UniProtKB/Swiss-Prot annotation:
Species per Swiss-Prot/TrEMBL record: Schizosaccharomyces pombe (strain 972 / ATCC 24843) (Fission yeast)
Keyword Kinase: no
Main location: membrane
Gene responsible for this protein: ypt7
Function statement: Ypt/Rab-type GTPases are key regulators of membrane trafficking and intracellular vesicular transport. They act as molecular switches that convert between GTP-bound and GDP-bound states, and regulate virtually all steps of membrane traffic from the formation of the transport vesicle at the donor membrane to its fusion at the target membrane. In the GDP-bound state, Ypt proteins are predominantly cytosolic, solubilized through the interaction with a GDP dissociation inhibitor (GDI).
Superkingdom as given in the UniProt entry: Eukaryota
GO MF annotation list: GTP binding; GTPase activity
GO cellular component: cytosol; fungal-type vacuole membrane; late endosome; vacuolar membrane; vacuole
Protein name: Ypt/Rab-type GTPase ypt7
Lineage: Eukaryota, Fungi, Dikarya, Ascomycota, Taphrinomycotina
Length: 205
């Protein structure tokens, strides 16, 4: 990857405590799973370098605390994000029902330049658990995504490494596209209106 321009992309992972955000992040970056992770305090992050469309991309993945008492810290971590990953546990209906509040809070705190097109992705985690324990159907999750601008959806298992790599490949592409679109928008700044009197010149020939 030497010689290629590198892009740093900030990705925020949000969801209720216990849905598996830390496990998903560690499975993606380190290809490891542990059932003994402690609840994240505040926020933590890992980085991974990948190649996306012949571009070297460093993903900075922020794993944020799912407890309400840490949500006030959001503005410090969310600003400058290029993509947001929403995670819920398919076996926990409450974790699905609170997704909108996480999404709305992110948009308020992060203040992206174009909230309507800012890239989100939804992960339904812990699909390795027995089917009879499942509380949120795939069709319900897809309906949620469709109603919010066709958000990409993956059903994942951090434990079994199901769809984790595939999900973050999509994250990297979405984040890179968002960064590129922001760069283009920045090139089209407001026109500068000059005082016409100051532009008048005289030529004495």
């Amino acid at each position: 990857m030497a010689g290629k321009k590198k892009h740093l992309l900030k990705v925020i992972i949000l969801g209720e405590s216990g849905v598996g955000k830390t496990s998903i992040m560690n499975q993606y970056v380190n290809r490891k799973f542990s059932k003994d992770y402690k609840a994240t305090i505040g926020a933590d992050f890992l980085t991974k370098e990948v190649l996306v469309d012949d571009k070297v991309v460093t993903l900075q993945l922020w794993d944020t605390a799912g407890q309400e008492r840490f949500q006030s810290l959001g503005v410090a971590f969310y600003r400058g994000a290029d993509c947001c990953v929403l995670v819920y546990d398919v076996n926990n209906s409450k974790s699905f029902e609170t997704l909108d509040s996480w999404r709305d809070e992110f948009l308020i705190q992060a203040s992206p330049s174009n909230p309507e097109t800012f890239p989100f992705i939804l992960l339904g985690n812990k699909v390795d658990v027995e089917e009879q324990k499942r509380m949120v159907s795939k069709s319900k999750a897809l309906a949620f995504c469709q109603a919010r601008g066709e958000i990409p959806y993956f059903e994942t298992s951090a434990k079994e490494a199901i769809n984790v790599q595939e999900a973050f490949e999509t994250v990297a592409k979405l984040a890179l596209e968002n960064m590129d679109s922001d760069d283009i928008a920045a090139d089209f700044t407001d026109p500068i209106h000059l005082d016409m009197e100051s532009q008048k010149t005289s030529c004495y020939c």
